[in-house]
Amino acid sequence: MINIRRLLGLQLVVAAGLLLSITHSFAQKADIGDEPGLIADDSIELPPDMQKQMVLYRTTEAPGTIIIATSERHLYVVQGNGRALRYGIGVGRDGFTWQGLLKISRKAEWPDWTPPPEMIARQPYLPRFMAGGPGNPLGARALYLGATVYRIHGTNRPDTIGTAVSSGCFRLVNADVADLYDRIPVGTKVIVRQKPEI
């Protein structure tokens, strides 16, 4: 005769094992790191052309240079030897696009956000200040562009990658901006142009 307690105990062990396996599998698939607060924001699958990848890229710029091609919705980090690391980005909406040459002036993890007065005038419902964290529109990291109000930053809206939606900043999913943040030092040259170099 089967011992009921032993059978129930065995079922609990099997159920716990399955739960741990599923949880571990989900965490690996979602690429959830050990860093507190850096949650996976890739709950939506980015289109293949918006996913981080190494690509062929001809340029005369030095390795380490960032080139942003706004019409393509891509940010390139020049690697040299005709290659670049490409990230999908969200860019400025109509009336908020720009081109130029700047340098990364500073970097911040989980940056606070204070919308500039011009943005408050256009969108008076915005908060006047928001502390850094998962709900902050700047996301997990920010790389500040010169003395401007523009940044390369994460987002709390990964569904906007590949679109023209911002007020002139460039947004990446949090996993990508954290990767970029670790690769790029302050002082890095950033070129913003309509199209990539051909």
Predicted region positions:
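N-terminal pre-domains immediately preceding structured catalytic cores
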Residues: 2-198
